A protein has these predicted regions:
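Flexible, low-hydrophobicity surface segments
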Residues: 1-165, 183-186, 271
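C-terminal catalytic domains of large/alpha subunits in multi-subunit enzymes
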Residues: 5-7, 90-91, 234-239, 269-276, ...
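Extended active-site and interfacial segments that coordinate phosphate-rich ligands
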Residues: 33-37, 58, 137-144, 220, ...
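Short beta-strand elements
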Residues: 43, 202-207, 296-305, 311-316, ...
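Phosphate/diphosphate-binding loops
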Residues: 127, 274-320, 543-572, 576
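Helix-loop-helix junctions that connect adjacent transmembrane helices in secondary transporters/permeases
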Residues: 153-233, 399-483, 694-708, 712-716
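Thiamine diphosphate
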Residues: 248-273, 277-279, 497-505
Length: 799
């Protein structure tokens, strides 16, 4: 209960300790709680766990057809392999056969047909993974091919949708376009992106008594896995416990996609009574799982001679793949963020959810927002080229105002707008205008190598657009030695969530972080959790943990006031000690006294985000609690004979409110920018004519490496600007907003290519801007520069 050998300190010594500040509370750059384990290889992931006795390994046989009717499945050849325990099809699933997260469309195993190359048709469980693989490939599947739809434009033209389209409308965009001083139209393809988490999808399931299961799953959404496992087994959720200590990366790819391996393992474990594990090899993982939604964009925009928008019509066609998954909300968010930082004037934005015979696309960092922002940044660049203006001048001319021109096309007022101040600060710190002139001079004297520069803003809304998800729970126990045990509903995927939440609890109790122990996210400790997504992890779970800690702290204050016969205002916690008027004692001493006085030292906490609502039928509301702002300035050099390029320098200024942990936040900004840059420059997904993903491994799908980093990367957080909303210690979310900073790299490449045409034409460079696309853009600029004005106009119109 206490250490009887400890030497008691005098009141003077305790007063000296009380006066000192915490070193690990909120606002300090505390290292990630698992940092040492990550770099030493000691961090335990699911595949590092000791295997259970008699554990089976599961391998799924995937469809090799994009669209086909299943005529027959013969699993008898599977049993010819020694060590095979069972082969299952959809007929063996005891409960619900569809694991669609919100709407049906994702059968656990194919039922009557297959909808994409990579869809699981059957699964084999055996003594080891290789035996299971060989046996699964021996099964005989007979198909009757059907005509697939593989192209998003074809799907749009055929109105081949997974869900109905949705419209945001403000004013009379058609009238504004018809009367605008200038008007341009264009199209843009925006590619998808593979999550490429280091740890592929994995689950391990242990059957328990009474039909229960313990599910160890690498998931961002433990409650959804719990729910779906219960449904496929036809049992109640209280029979299923999901345990999630850490993921080896997620980025949205483990929000819904983690359910399939967990459910397959659960079915096998149910049928055999044996523990079961399924780990996807990289190729199978990339074939089975959805990506970031590719988008096709059509724009029609009217503006004046300063570049200010008068009206805009946008068609945003998201390639959703073969089922709804989360596409309703993802395309909605693309529409919400199709303004980025700009007042659009009269606007019509149509969002289409196109169905193609590819894997069902899913959540990815930004959740549709980046695609909407890329569309409007293409428009800003196109206006600048049309008018012969600096693209930054056009962007600033369209910024949201503070007291006017400050309402979005979905009728949310942009409050606490920091765009102008942040842009001005970044202009100065990055020496934008001096470098712009220097680059013009360089390009005028360099026929082959061309430099580009772009400064782009970010305004990103924080909250789940599905309002009911904006809630979180936490559970805190304080033990009699003064140590603290914390569980919350969020999941740790390397982003530092556990560290931040522990800092919050340490700050409330005014103890150092080493007193706070966070263990695995577990559905039997914190139930009904929302996914760790939408940048909400710290906002929701930090606030829930703060609530739980404050409940216990209030009990302690009330007890101390009674015990020492003082007012509650006389009780103060600071640096691991408690001052009760003139008397000081250690935190653990107060805890022991409270325990003997039968004060509860445990509490749940709960939080729900206030103020938000969205009426989808009217397409208006306040879907976001607040906005996070940022800006990035990128400089690039392009070899116009090969299309190759190098990022020379990037300056970033980002708004995180009052940072909970500046070191972790800067790491998130750096990583977000690089991942966004990778999406828009090198991460190209390629399917063949039969719908098979060809870029299905690290040999063919390239993510940024060390050599792709800007040679000079400067990141700064906005200082002395707390979040005006009542968030956890007035911080702001930092998971997704920095991703959109990468748009500056794409715009800088286009700026360099545009210099070949004297900045008079907008290069046709779809995203990602691979060297091949950049080379074609360079050739286009050369042809336009050589053409007569009428010919150039005709050429542009044909693009």
């Amino acid at each position: 209960m206490s250490n009887h050998h400890a030497v008691e300190k005098t009141q003077a010594e305790l007063a000296e300790l009380f006066a000192k500040d915490l070193t690990t509370g909120v606002g300090r750059s505390v290292k990630h709680d698992s940092a040492a384990k990550h770099v030493s290889g000691e961090a335990q992931y699911i595949d590092d766990r000791l295997e259970f006795p008699n554990q089976l390994h599961v391998y799924a046989r995937l469809s090799d057809r994009a669209h086909a009717k299943i005529i027959s499945i013969d699993t008898k050849p599977c049993y010819a392999f020694e060590g095979v325990r069972i082969a299952i099809t959809h007929e063996d699933v005891p409960g619900l056969k569809d694991i669609g997260p919100l709407l049906p469309g994702d059968p656990l195993l194919a039922i009557d047909d297959v909808q994409f190359v990579g869809q699981p048709v059957l699964a084999v469980a055996a003594k080891d993974l290789e035996t299971a693989r060989k046996a699964a490939m021996a099964a005989i599947i007979e198909y009757e091919d059907l005509e697939p739809v593989l192209d998003v434009v074809e799907a749009l033209r055929k109105r081949h949708f997974v869900l109905d389209s949705h419209t945001h409308q403000r004013g009379d965009s058609a009238g504004a376009l018809a009367t605008a001083e200038h008007r341009i139209q264009g199209t843009l393809h925006i590619g998808g992106q593979e999550h490429f988490y280091l740890e592929t999808q994995i689950s391990s399931v242990m059957p328990t008594e009474d039909g229960g299961m313990i599910v160890y799953c690498s998931t961002q959404n433990p409650t959804e896995v719990q729910k779906l496992v219960a449904e496929v087994l036809d049992v109640s959720m209280n029979k299923i416990v999901v345990d999630m200590r850490r993921m080896g990366g997620g980025f949205g790819g483990k929000e819904t996609q983690a359910a399939s391996p967990a459910c397959l393992c659960a079915v096998v474990a149910h049928l055999t009574g044996q523990p079961t594990k399924m780990r996807l090899p990289r190729v199978e993982d990339m074939l089975m799982t959805g990506k970031r939604h590719p988008f096709y964009v059509e724009y029609d925009v009217g503006f004046d001679s300063t570049g200010r928008l008068h009206g805009i019509a946008l068609e945003l066609a998201g390639n959703c793949g073969c089922s709804p998954d989360l596409s309703a909300s993802i395309v909605d968010r693309a529409m919400f963020h199709a303004d980025n930082s700009y007042y659009l004037g009269d606007a019509t934005i149509n969002g289409h959810r196109c169905k193609t015979n590819t894997a069902s696309n899913t959540a990815y960092r930004g959740f549709g927002g980046p695609q909407g922002m890329v569309a409007i940044e293409e428009v800003m660049d196109a206006i600048a080229r049309h008018l012969g203006l600096d693209p930054l001048a056009v962007r600033k001319a369209n910024y949201y105002g503070k007291t006017e021109r400050n309402v979005t096309h979905y009728y949310q007022t942009v409050e606490h707008n920091m765009l102008e101040e942040m842009t001005a600060e970044l202009e100065e710190s990055s020496q934008y205008f001096e470098r712009r002139e220097a680059i013009r001079r360089y390009n005028a004297n360099s026929p082959i190598l061309k430099k580009g520069l772009a400064l782009t803003p970010v305004k990103f809304g924080i909250s789940f657009t599905a309002s009911f998800l904006n809630q979180a729970g936490a559970l805190i126990h304080v033990y009699t030695d003064g140590s603290i045990h914390l569980n919350h509903g969020g999941t740790e995927m390397g982003q530092g969530l556990n560290t931040k939440v522990a800092q919050v609890v340490a700050e409330v109790f005014q103890v150092e972080m080493d007193r706070v122990q966070i263990t695995a996210t577990n559905t039997d400790k914190v139930p009904n959790t929302s996914p760790t997504a939408a940048s909400s992890g710290a906002d929701l779970n930090g606030k829930a943990a703060q609530n739980a800690a404050e409940i216990i702290k209030k009990r302690l204050i009330e007890f101390a006031a009674r015990q020492y016969k003082v007012s509650e205002e006389d009780v103060e916690f600071h640096n691991g000690h408690v001052r009760i008027r003139d008397h000081i004692l250690t935190f653990e001493a107060l805890i022991q006294q409270a325990y003997f006085a039968q004060v509860s030292l445990s509490s749940t906490g709960f939080y729900k985000t206030p103020k938000i609502f969205y009426d989808r039928s009217q397409a208006r509301g306040r879907p976001f609690y607040y906005y996070a702002f940022g800006a990035a300035c990128c400089e690039v050099i392009v070899d116009t004979l090969t299309g190759e390029y190098k990022m020379l320098r990037t300056d970033i200024l980002h708004d995180v409110g009052a940072s909970l942990n500046p070191a972790i936040d800067i790491g998130q900004v750096e990583g977000g920018f690089i991942q966004g840059m990778g999406w828009l420059t090198m991460e190209e997904l390629v399917w063949n004519a039969k719908g098979k993903l060809m870029t299905n491994g690290p040999a063919s799908y390239k993510i940024p490496a060390v050599a792709d980093m800007p040679l000079d990367l400067r990141v700064k957080l906005v200082e002395n600007r707390k979040n005006p909303e009542d968030t956890v210690f007035h911080s702001k979310a930092v998971g997704e907003p920095p991703f959109m900073l990468g748009i500056a790299s794409w715009c800088a490449i286009k700026d360099a290519v545009a210099s070949l045409g004297d900045y008079k034409h907008q290069p046709k460079i779809d995203a990602p801007a691979t060297p091949e696309r950049v080379l074609w853009g360079c050739e286009q600029m050369r042809q336009l520069k050589a053409a007569k004005p009428a010919e150039a106009e005709a050429e542009l119109a044909s693009l």
